[in-house]
Amino acid sequence: MMLSASSPVRHLKATPLRPCSGRLSSAGRDPAGGESLLRVSHIFERYTMTTFRSGIALTAALMLAALTGCGASNTASSSPSTSASSSVSAVSSSVASSQAWKDLVSATGVEITYSADGSRVLTDNSGQKVELPATVDRIANLWDANNQVMLLLGSSNHIVATTQQISKMPWYKKVQPKITQASTPVSGTDLNVEELLKAKPDVVVSIDKTQVEKARAAGLTTVQLGFQDFAGLKKNVVMTAEVLGTDQARSQAIKYITYLEKNLKFVIERTASLSDDQRPKVLHIAGGSDVTKVDGSDSIIGEWMKATGAKNSIDGVANYKNISLEQIIASAPDAIIVGNSDAQQGIDSIKADAAWKDIPAVKNDKLYRNPVGTFKWDRYSTEEALHLLWAGKTLHPELFTDVDLVKETREFYSTFYGYNLTEDEAQRILAGQNPAS
């Protein structure tokens, strides 16, 4: 049974504060109606959101906007629903001028100024002030992960140039088949400027400094983005919404960040009482093709491990770092998670290699495939919001028995991508498997 945000607070053991559970209508409103100001103010007290790396509190205006769509049901339960479909109602027109959006822009540290004609000046991650056109119809998204952000913000159909990796990602193609029609001027980090120009983009997005310089030298409006932690993820979503410049994108950004914040809060509270000995040491391997390339504590991987009641077994190392097998053995991980769509290859090679056999995770068969959806859940992904729930339930199943990962995944895809996953499709994503067809 689902518990709505309007339900009375129940003091149950290890039960988190809950988001609203009302489904949004096509207009972005809960059909059940709105909340009284008094009720909303109480809800806000329960759900004040913080950006955990920066320590910036999101303001009451954002929270009130997020709760506008919650129904008035008083059904209570100890189930920890954090349904994506219930995170926030659609913000009214002219979102850019709304207090909720202004507060979110401020909280995430985004620098943006607006002109009367609808054009905008955005300060990108390189510190460059980029003047963006009032209307952005054609986008060259040269950063793999940010293609997923544009999918979430409702603008993936405007991507006219992308990367070879994204054009081949099975779940992205399943959700947005049009991505296969986009040109692919980027292979690895190499940019073919001539091919990029043929796509005639209004705006180019990239994480790579050299690509940005080449695109700007070719006379293209170019924005450099990127992030390494949850605070950066939220900032990146807001910046991308401003690149797109639509109310739909800004509304989706508010909705998504509200959902992400609630899931962060939920898993942290659910695992808060664990002692240090109860927090497993986890080794995260970037992909199955190279089992000594790991993601250490100084990364978003280390951040979600900490949030979900675990410790990264490789301390003081960033992501995608090659270390020795001896270092891995010495770190004695209690669990091993392998990322990427080739995760099973890595798990099989670990099990077949006698050098790994005395590692606690291997002896106790605690080897897991990371989920992979429209992008890898473990890094640079908007599906990090789901990954928090998966990691919590995987590493501490006894604490998360009431989390239905299939249901959460299906609702996330429906709410943020407009795609209705079947139960089998959701299970395949959670297992790190490609679509059946």
Task: Give the residues covered by each predicted segment.
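Short, Lys/Arg-enriched N-terminal segments with co-localized hydrophobic residues
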Residues: R29-T48
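Alpha-helical, coiled-coil/dimerization segments enriched in small aliphatic residues
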Residues: K293-Y320
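Secretory targeting and sorting signals
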Residues: T50-G71
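Bacterial lipoprotein signal-peptidase II cleavage site
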Residues: G69-P80
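Proline-aspartate-enriched helix->loop->beta-strand connector
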Residues: S187-G188, N192-S206, L325-S341
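Extracytoplasmic substrate-binding proteins
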Residues: K129, E213-V291, I314-D315, R369-A436
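Short helix-initiation/N-cap motifs at beta->coil->alpha
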Residues: N125-G127, A182-E194, V317-L325
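A short, structured surface patch at a secondary-structure boundary
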Residues: N141-A199, V203
